[in-house]
C-alpha cells in the first residue's frame, strides 16, 4: 500500500490520517501504476477526491472545495484529510479510537481550549463530532485534564524549570527501541569521560539558571539506562546534582532504574542516599519468552528481586512500565503482566502501546505480530488498574503507534509524576544535560519558546563539549531578552 497526495502544498495531515489505517505505508511522489495498491488523495480545481485501491478492488469519494477560511471554512488540507479518513473508515471497517486526531497531546488540547474560554459543550463537540474521537478515550482525557489542573499551577509558575539528565548507555538494545544509546560492553571506555562532561554541564546549567533567576521544580535522570553507570559513577553524578541544587525545594526527583540486569542493591542505596524521591523499574512484560524475544537479558524473577531490593533500600515511590503489543505477547500474557505489576503494589504503573519506530529491530526485521490483532483488547485490561485504586494522570500519543492508541500513566492518589505532566503539557522550561538533550525554554506564559540542542551521539558530545557549554549560555540570553511579565529585574 502506497500513499499519493497531490494538489496541496503539504499533505502532512492526509499522510498521517492514512497511516491510522496503514501504519507503515510509504509516501510516494509519483502516481501509482495501474492496479497498484494505494490511497490517492487529490485537491482538484473543482473539488476534493480520494480513492483507495487494494487487492484489485477500488472505492472513491468526492467533496466540494471548502469555503474560504475568512468565511469559516476548513483548510483544504483538513477537508481532504477528513474525506480520506471517512473513505478509509468505511473501506477497512476500522474506527480509530482517537478518530482523526493525529496530535500527541490530546490532554493539552483540552487545557488550551479551556484557557481560550471554550465551553465544555463546545469542547465535547470538537472531540466527538469534528474529530470522531470515541467517547471512552475523550472521557479519559477529560478526567486527566481535571486531575492535572492543580499540578500545572505549580509547574507553570513564572520562571520555574525542570532538569533532565540523559544517560545514553544500555546493557543491550531492546528490539522496539530506536533511541540513540550505546552498548555498555562495547562502549564502556566512553562512560567515564561522558560522566565527567555531564557533571560539568550540570554545573553550567546551575550557573545559567541562577543568572536567569530560574527556580528548579523537578529532576529526571533518564536514558538509556541510568543504572548502567557504576555505583561510583552514580555517586559522582548525583553528588554533583546535590552540590549544585537545593533538593529540599524540588517537588520530585526521579531516577530510571529501569533494568534489573544492571541495577543492584548498592546502586539502589546510592540513588536513595543522594536524594531521589522516585524511581522507575520497568519490566515491560513479566513473560520470560517475550523478554527474550525483545532482547532483554534478564528474567521476570530478576524484576521481582530488583523490586524487593528497591523496597528494602527505602524507595517508597516506584513506577513500573509495561508495553502492550510486544511481539509474542498475547492478551492473556499481557493480563498476567498487569496483574503481576498490580500485586507488587507500586505507586505508579505506566502502560505504553508499542510504537513502530523505523530504526527499531521490530520494524527492520518485520516482527509486527500485533498490528491490529489484540492490542486494543490488551488496553481494555487496564480496567484492572482502576479496580485496584489507580487513576490515569497523564497521557500522550506517538506516530505509528499500534491502532493509533495511547500511553497512559496510572498512579495511586497523591503519587502523580510531576515531571511527566510538565513535559507533556509544555508549561515550563526543561533544561537538558547529556547527549541528545533538547533544552526547551518557555517564557511569557508559553507564548515564547526556544530550543537548544546538544549533540546527538555520546562520542560527539564528548569531543565537542566546549560547544555544548557555549550553547548553554543561550539560557540566560533567552531570559535577558524576555520583555514579558516574567522579565528579571
Residue ranges and their predicted role:
Residues 35-36, 355, 359-433:
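A C-terminal junction/extension of Radical SAM enzymes
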Amino acid at each position: 500500500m502506497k500513499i499519493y497526495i497531490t494538489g496541496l502544498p503539504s499533505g502532512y495531515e492526509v499522510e498521517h490520517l492514512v497511516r491510522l489505517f496503514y501504519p507503515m505505508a510509504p509516501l510516494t511522489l509519483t502516481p501509482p501504476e495501474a492496479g497498484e495498491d494505494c490511497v490517492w488523495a487529490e485537491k482538484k480545481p473543482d473539488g476534493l477526491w480520494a480513492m483507495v485501491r487494494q487487492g484489485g478492488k477500488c472505492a472513491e469519494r468526492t467533496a466540494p472545495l471548502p469555503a474560504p477560511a475568512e468565511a469559516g471554512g476548513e483548510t483544504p488540507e483538513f477537508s481532504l484529510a477528513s474525506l480520506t479518513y471517512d473513505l478509509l473508515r468505511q473501506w477497512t471497517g476500522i474506527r480509530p479510537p482517537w478518530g482523526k486526531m493525529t496530535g500527541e497531546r490530546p490532554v493539552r488540547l483540552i487545557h488550551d481550549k479551556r484557557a481560550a474560554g471554550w465551553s465544555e459543550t463546545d469542547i465535547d463537540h470538537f472531540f466527538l463530532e469534528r474529530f470522531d474521537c470515541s467517547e471512552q478515550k475523550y472521557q479519559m482525557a477529560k478526567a486527566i485534564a481535571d486531575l492535572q489542573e492543580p499540578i500545572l499551577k505549580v509547574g507553570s509558575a513564572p520562571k520555574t524549570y525542570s532538569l533532565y539528565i540523559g544517560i545514553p548507555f544500555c546493557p543491550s538494545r531492546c528490539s522496539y527501541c530506536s533511541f540513540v544509546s550505546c552498548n555498555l560492553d562495547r562502549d564502556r571506555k566512553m562512560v567515564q569521560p561522558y560522566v565527567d562532561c555531564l557533571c560539568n554541564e550540570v554545573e553550567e546549567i546551575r550557573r545559567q539558571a541562577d543568572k536567569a533567576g530560574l527556580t528548579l521544580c523537578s529532576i529526571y535522570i533518564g536514558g538509556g539506562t541510568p543504572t548502567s553507570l557504576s555505583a561510583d559513577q552514580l555517586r559522582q553524578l548525583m553528588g554533583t546534582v546535590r552540590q549544585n541544587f537545593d533538593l529540599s525545594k524540588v517537588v520530585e526527583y526521579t531516577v530510571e532504574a529501569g533494568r534489573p540486569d544492571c541495577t543492584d542493591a548498592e546502586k539502589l542505596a546510592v540513588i536513595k542516599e543522594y536524594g531521589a524521591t522516585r524511581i522507575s523499574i520497568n519490566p515491560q512484560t513479566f513473560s520470560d519468552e517475550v523478554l527474550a524475544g525483545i532482547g532483554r537479558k534478564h528474567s521476570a524473577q530478576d524484576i521481582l528481586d530488583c523490586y524487593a531490593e528497591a523496597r528494602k533500600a527505602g524507595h517508597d515511590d516506584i513506577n513500573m512500565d509495561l508495553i502492550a503489543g510486544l511481539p509474542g505477547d498475547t492478551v492473556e500474557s499481557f493480563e498476567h503482566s498487569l496483574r503481576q505489576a498490580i500485586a507488587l503494589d507500586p505507586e505508579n504503573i505506566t502502560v505504553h502501546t508499542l510504537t513502530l519506530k523505523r530504526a527499531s529491530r521490530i520494524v527492520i526485521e518485520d516482527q509486527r505480530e500485533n498490528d491490529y490483532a489484540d492490542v486494543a483488547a490488551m488496553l481494555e485490561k487496564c480496567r484492572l488498574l482502576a479496580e485496584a485504586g489507580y487513576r490515569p494522570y497523564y497521557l500522550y500519543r506517538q506516530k505509528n503507534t499500534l491502532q493509533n492508541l495511547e500511553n497512559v500513566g496510572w498512579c495511586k492518589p497523591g503519587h502523580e509524576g510531576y515531571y511527566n505532566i510538565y513535559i507533556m503539557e509544555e508549561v515550563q522550561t526543561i533544561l537538558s544535560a547529556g547527549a541528545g538533550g533538547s533544552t526547551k525554554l518557555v517564557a511569557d506564559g508559553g507564548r515564547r519558546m526556544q530550543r537548544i540542542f546538544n549533540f546527538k551521539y555520546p562520542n560527539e558530545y564528548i569531543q565537542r563539549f566546549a560547544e555544548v557549554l557555549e550553547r548553554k549560555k543561550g539560557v540566560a540570553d533567552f531570559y535577558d531578552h524576555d520583555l514579558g511579565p516574567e522579565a528579571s529585574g
